[in-house]
Design a protein with these regions (language model features):
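A short, hydrophobic C-terminal helix/tail in secreted or cell-surface proteins
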Residues: 328-334
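Nucleic acid-machinery interaction/catalytic patches
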Residues: 1-327
Length: 334
């Protein structure tokens, strides 16, 4: 059975040919490209102009006029804005954890293309609702406190108190922080992604085709990015899934995401390539009473089962902690 990356290499070569110099492959991470190049090389006995390849995060960074900021510097810059807006005397040490949390929230806001003004306005309304129960009878108050139990007055920790007290400042902090970072030419990842989408000129892109391979759940900024390239006729999509999730099970969670992706961005590969789960499997169970027993069995299994380097590359071992120290050499280091 051909692997997903083999199918992609074969299909891409059939459609574009030997010269892939104006093509870039975009993967969720960097590892997949190592295997893809081997499969692509096997498609022809002639020299091939290999495509460029990068992760989605690398692609956004290349398209951005800003640089990804160092995590420590990002927190320090946020701390400056925080001090100015709140007049807080909190030290940087005390603020650091809270700063990382807030940057993570801002990152989610931008990656999901949320209207920040509306979001933080709604958060302030929620705070007011939770802080003032005078218009509710006792039963209604208890019901609301149960629903928002993580934020209820009785359960508030010091960290939550600090967070809630700043809700009315979050919108201002968010905008000022982004403005300051823009002046410095740096950004946190979500800000960088969002700026790319808002400023993207598809007529000035470096490559003729952007090949997106093996993605799954997309955030809104990725979806918008895919749509912009699709509209410019610069995108091709290869989705890895199985018909078991999209056809056999009604409303399976994984199937919902896959079907949405397939509807928005049709797959270059036919459905017939993705009907594997229903085929017979050869599954062997090994009884091991403890994790140490599993660890002792692994070297024996690797040496008796995987006889060639190619077999090693086509198999994976999911490691628990004790297994990390018992994998046989030299195969575990290649």
């Amino acid at each position: 059975m051909q692997s997903f990356l083999q199918l992609v290499a074969h299909d891409l070569y059939a459609k574009i040919g030997n010269d892939l110099s104006r093509t870039v492959l975009v993967f969720p991470n960097k590892r997949a490209n190592l295997f893809f190049n081997e499969h692509l090389a096997g498609e022809s006995d002639q020299p091939i102009w290999s495509p460029a390849a990068m992760s989605i995060s690398d692609l956004f960074r290349k398209l951005s006029v800003q640089k990804a900021g160092d995590p420590i510097r990002l927190v320090c810059e946020l701390y400056k804005v925080f001090r100015e807006e709140t007049e807080s005397q909190e030290t940087l040490d005390d603020f650091y954890f809270w700063g990382e949390l807030l940057i993570s929230d801002f990152d989610d806001v931008d990656k999901n293309l949320v209207d920040a003004d509306k979001l933080f306005s709604n958060l302030q309304d929620l705070k007011n609702l939770m802080d003032d129960y005078e218009f509710l009878d006792k039963e209604q108050e208890e019901a609301i406190q149960q629903f928002f139990q993580n934020f209820s007055i009785e359960r508030r920790t010091v960290l939550k108190e600090k967070f809630i007290s700043l809700w009315d400042k979050l919108g201002t902090i968010y905008h000022r922080y982004r403005e300051n970072l823009a002046e410095l030419g740096i950004a946190y990842e979500g800000m960088l992604y969002r700026n790319v989408i808002e400023q993207l000129d598809t007529t000035r892109l470096k490559y003729d085709k952007y090949i997106f391979v093996g993605f799954n759940v997309l955030n809104k900024v990725e979806t918008k990015f895919f749509q912009l390239l699709q509209d410019a006729d610069k995108a091709m999509f290869y989705w890895d899934y199985d018909l078991f999730y999209t056809k056999q099970i009604v409303k399976h969670e994984a199937g919902e995401f896959i079907n949405r992706n397939l509807k928005l961005f049709p797959n270059e590969l036919p459905e017939s390539c993705f009907d594997t789960l229903r085929k017979p499997k050869n599954i062997r169970y090994i009884s091991a009473s403890t994790e140490n027993a599993q660890a002792r069995f692994l070297p024996e299994w690797v040496q008796s089962t995987l006889s060639t380097a190619n077999e090693e590359k086509e198999n994976a071992v999911v490691l628990c902690n004790c297994l990390l120290y018992t994998s046989p050499s030299p195969r575990d280091t290649r």
